[in-house]
């Protein structure tokens, strides 16, 4: 099995820790005044979506997880899962909402996503880093809002995701959102 040093691991790398698959969120190198340097690694479990933080000795080797990523088109949502289709073979698979976790808020019909397979089973979905979506509901910006220091307001996107947007953005506008953080990035000109 392939291995990678903790000092080389970056965000997005898939590793196996205690025979469980994780995707790395962040890797922080720490050099204390006394003692050995170590890496504080934040990672998300691929099967449960739970985020944990572990420390490893600097230079320690971690096994790379045996995962495959395939681009698949989302067809539709059901009450207990989401149906995806492989555009090459037209094979359809269903991934449970439990496996997808919070990523479900970024899923739109007829869009392409990275589906992650672990030991031959579809276990998770990764949306693109940035997505363009239409705002379906938000309150109008009221004159004087910025005087009170309020420069953001809540908005609901076409996928159902809730994000904070600047007060000048209105309902029906298309915006660019960072799916990793759920933050507004910019307006999208039509």
From Swiss-Prot:
Give compartment(s). Cytoplasm
The principal location of this protein is: cytoplasm
**Keyword terms, alphabetized:** Cytoplasm, Elongation factor, Protein biosynthesis
Keyword match Cytoplasm: yes
Superkingdom field: Bacteria
Report the GO terms under cellular component: cytoplasm
- Keyword Cytoplasm, does the record have it? yes
Gene Ontology biological process terms from the UniProt entry: peptide biosynthetic process
Give GO MF terms, alphabetically. translation elongation factor activity
State its role. Involved in peptide bond synthesis. Stimulates efficient translation and peptide-bond synthesis on native or reconstituted 70S ribosomes in vitro. Probably functions indirectly by altering the affinity of the ribosome for aminoacyl-tRNA, thus increasing their reactivity as acceptors for peptidyl transferase.
Q: Report the sequence similarity comment from the record.
A: Belongs to the elongation factor P family.
Q: Which NCBIfam families match?
A: efp, PRK00529.1
Protein name, UniProt field: Elongation factor P 2
Q: Which organism is it from?
A: Protochlamydia amoebophila (strain UWE25)
């Amino acid at each position: 099995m392939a291995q990678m040093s903790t000092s080389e691991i970056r965000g997005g790398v898939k590793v196996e820790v205690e025979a469980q698959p994780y995707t790395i969120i962040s890797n922080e190198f720490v050099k204390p005044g006394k003692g050995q340097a170590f890496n504080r690694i934040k990672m998300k479990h691929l099967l449960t979506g739970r985020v944990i933080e572990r420390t490893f000795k600097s230079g320690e080797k971690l096994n790379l997880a045996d995962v495959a990523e395939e681009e698949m088109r989302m067809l539709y949502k059901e009450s207990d899962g989401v149906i995806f289709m492989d555009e090459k073979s037209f094979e359809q698979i269903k991934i449970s909402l439990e496996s997808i976790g919070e990523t479900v808020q970024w899923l739109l019909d007829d869009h392409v996503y990275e589906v992650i397979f672990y030991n031959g089973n579809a276990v998770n979905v990764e949306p693109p880093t940035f997505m363009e979506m239409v705002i379906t509901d938000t309150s109008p910006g009221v004159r004087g809002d910025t005087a009170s220091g309020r420069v953001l307001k809540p908005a609901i996107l076409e996928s159902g995701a809730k994000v904070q947007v600047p007060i000048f953005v209105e309902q029906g506008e298309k915006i660019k959102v960072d799916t990793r953080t759920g933050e507004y990035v910019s307006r999208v000109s039509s």
